Amino acid sequence: MSTQSFADRRSLEGVKPGVVVVGGLLALMWVLEIIDSASFHALDQLGIIARNIGSLPHILTAPWLHFGFPHLISNSVPFLILGLLTWLAGPGRWLAVTLITVVTSGLTVWLIAPSNTITLGASGLVFGYLAYLLVRGFFTRNIWEIALSVAVFFFYGSILLGVLPGASGVSWQGHLGGAIGGFIAAKFLHGSDPAIRRV
């Protein structure tokens, strides 16, 4: 036999929808990549083309598409883990972080990526979730959220170098825009949270 507090049970219940939503989005990415491969990469045209007015709506489609399975595989695990950790802040906040990051990442790519390039992939979202989780604790002053920030930095902090120009074919612009979006989301959602003071 075992016992479980109501708070623990409620916490576990809160995670289940996150697994469904975040896991469902990841499954959607895999389905789209299967369709893309079967259609000779026809869906790649839904990526962001820098400074192409007609490509602006693709800011909303590009994060869910990838240039092949190796590209998708590299994004899958961090998207799932960081997405679920962000979900723990609440479904509404997860949605806000996701939408803000999609827009800031996509606009950054559209504005400053090299001309005549197409950008796809969920890495902008990954960087958005990462930045949100890293800075949220400093706005909330919550000891557990600060501890989570430290743990996330320990495991994923090294990928922050991806916001700098580097390897050919890697969209540092999308990474930078995603990280900016994560910071903006943390400031917007938690910047007015009262600090905990001890006297």
Tell me what each language-model feature is.
Residues 2-199:
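A detector for small-residue-rich transmembrane helices and their helix-helix packing motifs
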